């Protein structure tokens, strides 16, 4: 198999670290591996597959000779993606910078792989919560068109980075020792006011917009329509940060154009790649973030009719937002391109 020169921008962060784990786990065919980060992280050494790599500071010349550039996310995407594309690399980007650009495909490989072919050098990775939800929606949409979605998310602190994890740990310790819980990170470090996440829920992820939705909520709404190619789908979302380390959970209410049978819905989900049913109420079996972390797949449970509205169903979906919600989805896009010969110049 041909091997490719790969660059990882943001190699020292949570998603960048996950890229490395997955490249090894999935035997991704790389020849050269170039680890890039900010000036602050440059010079750091990373042991990977028996070799020591030195992290380089990202510059406009960092992508010469690179075939695939995996961007872990953040504001640097806007700065460096054009340089990477100019050198001939395909950029697969985890930031929100390009997601709603009509010239940039927004891809979940199991859902809309054909959109990859529309790329002009950049392919966008969706928001983590969007990915987890559309993985559950797509097999059901193939049974009957979806008219309306009401989703509430329960998002882990690792979605806010290592700082979110550290703050939950420290606050839990402080609370157990009778000390005041200090808050500096959530709902967002850039905001003027912060709240403890330990023993708490924060119904704000990202900033509020003029319509009183948060930016995170509007990402889910707009990105889902783009991925599913259905601008008429009505969607409303409430996104909540919860005191869980890893894996996002979502309660999803779905109204269809016509009625479906529960057994057909469960069969469709189980037959769809990357997602599986975990649903046995009699034996208290349902997906939980503690037990689905580090997994490749997303998991669906609590599938049932909404008795208040016809043709409407409820489900609960859980997925690892660092894996399928970020690094795994990105790598899968590259794998689809390699498998189909779409990287050949």
Question: Which ranges hold each PLM region?
Answer:
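N-terminal Rossmann-like NAD(P) cofactor-binding subdomain of oxidoreductases
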Residues: 1-192, 232-234, 284-286, 298-299, ...
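Charged docking surfaces used in two-component/phosphorelay signaling
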Residues: 69, 157-345
């Amino acid at each position: 198999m041909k091997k490719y020169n790969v660059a990882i921008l943001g190699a020292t962060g949570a998603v960048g670290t996950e890229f490395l784990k997955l490249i090894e786990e999935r035997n991704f065919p790389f020849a050269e591996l170039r680890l890039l980060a900010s000036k602050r992280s440059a010079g750091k050494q990373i042991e990977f597959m028996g070799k020591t790599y030195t992290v380089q500071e990202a510059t406009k010349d960092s992508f010469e000779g690179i075939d695939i550039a995996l961007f872990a996310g953040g504001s640097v995407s806007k700065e460096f993606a054009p340089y990477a594309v100019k050198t001939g690399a395909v950029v697969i980007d985890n930031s929100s910078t390009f997601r709603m650009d009509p010239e940039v495909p927004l891809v979940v490989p199991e859902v809309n792989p054909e959109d990859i072919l529309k790329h002009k050098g950049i392919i966008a990775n969706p928001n983590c919560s969007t990915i987890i939800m559309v993985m559950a929606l797509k097999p059901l949409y193939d049974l009957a068109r979806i008219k309306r979605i009401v989703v509430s998310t329960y998002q882990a602190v690792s979605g806010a980075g290592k700082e979110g994890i550290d703050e939950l740990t420290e606050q839990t310790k402080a609370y157990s020792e009778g000390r005041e819980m200090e808050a500096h990170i959530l709902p967002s470090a850039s905001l003027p006011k912060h709240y403890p996440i330990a023993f708490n829920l924060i119904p704000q992820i990202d900033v509020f917009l003029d319509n009183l939705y948060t930016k995170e909520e509007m990402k889910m709404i707009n990105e889902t329509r783009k991925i599913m190619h259905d601008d008429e789908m009505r969607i409303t979302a409430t996104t909540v940060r919860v005191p869980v380390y890893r894996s996002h959970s979502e309660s999803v209410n779905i109204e269809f154009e016509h009625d479906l049978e529960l057994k057909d819905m469960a069969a469709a989900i189980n037959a769809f790649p990357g997602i599986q049913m975990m649903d046995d109420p009699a034996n208290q079996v349902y997906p939980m973030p503690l037990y689905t972390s580090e997994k490749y797949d997303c998991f669906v449970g609590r599938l049932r009719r909404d008795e208040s509205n016809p043709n409407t169903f409820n489900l609960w979906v859980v997925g690892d937002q660092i894996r399928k919600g970020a690094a795994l989805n990105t790598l899968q896009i590259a794998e689809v391109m390699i498998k189909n010969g779409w990287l050949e110049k």
